[in-house]
């Protein structure tokens, strides 16, 4: 008797993870392989698309090798969003690196659009502000940089896809070329009202529709595996879910109805809540598609560009590359001593959306120590999450009762207590570090008939801890006001 499992992949910026999930929603095995990001020029962030595929294969093989008498009955994929690449349709060879969501090569293009009628059109159709974060403007630059890129694209010789699409192509041996609604909605080329690629936006950014994948529900049959070479994964296994990682975490947390909000802490961070209908013009926030599982579900989101990566940058500057050691250094300081770090290393995301903002370390004096600077870097994670949380409260016009949290940084108990004290709201911390992969597995299980309703998935057992805020800490609240002043300084424009 073999135990049926779903192989769920969570391909992030810094790690490719694989988990095996059974019909009771339990993780039976897991593995992770580290990934590299390169910065060949200032403002450019890239990854090797084939190295990502090899890392996914390695993680999957290690995960499956630890199972006893199990059979993979479905593959589900969660992925870093807004990263994009171009590959040759005939050979499957990447024509570009995977251009990361952090990449800013399209900054000038986006600045030229700011405040224009075209920018208003983009936001009204996609729910997204004009920003280099999103693939549309990046693809405009990538096709221009690729020899004969525009001509080849118009002839249909090239494929354009986000990470889910690339992995689906690889798992299927080049037979499946599709993406899901959640990833399509992040390209800034997808009309979230009509549920299709938008011809006006394709023309605006110069992207031929013939190069784009089919868009299918997140929970659906996306293809079948080919001969991948992954031990333990047979050919002809259905690929049953594709979904962006933040959306997958929302689903994995069991948040399928409005009124709850989650934050995923990673390289960057995402705060997201489900909504019934698109909520356009929510100041500083984006409206997007949460998922499609037979029914289209929308979400309100705030994207923060640098949280974990901002803290890591501080570590590099201090010569402390270990996050563990950097955290210990930060916590050795009793307070930030008025020092603040605004990690606008490639502009600011939500709720400011300021591409011209620049990183700032302020409040320094002759008594400032490396420990104080490290603490400023750690606190910046919580301050940025608070900025988006309060923006969401303002849009909701109601107090949000709690914040569900997941991601690597949630293992830092001090940071989570600081976050709760800052928000004056309880945090509900999911002890499972693989929430995005679980969310993809849940959607895949729904496709396979393991679960019929979202309520069943929301009711699955989850190991959580509630972190209550301390009594009102006036020092923390005053510090937050100083943070807001620091952000304003980071956004100052130098005089011409």
Swiss-Prot record:
It is an enzyme of class 2 (transferase). Involved in catabolism of D-apiose. Catalyzes phosphorylation of apulose to form apulose 4-phosphate. Its EC number is 2.7.1.233. Keywords: ATP-binding, Carbohydrate metabolism, Kinase, Nucleotide-binding, Transferase. It holds the Pfam family FGGY_N. It catalyses: apulose + ATP = apulose 4-phosphate + ADP + H(+). ATP binds at residues 13-15, 267, 308, 408-412. GO terms for molecular function: ATP binding; glycerol kinase activity. InterPro entries: ATPase_NBD, Carb_kinase_FGGY, FGGY_C, FGGY_N. GO terms for biological process: glycerol catabolic process. This is Apulose kinase. It comes from the Bacteria. GO terms for cellular component: cytosol. Pathway: Carbohydrate metabolism. Belongs to the FGGY kinase family. Coiled coil: none annotated.
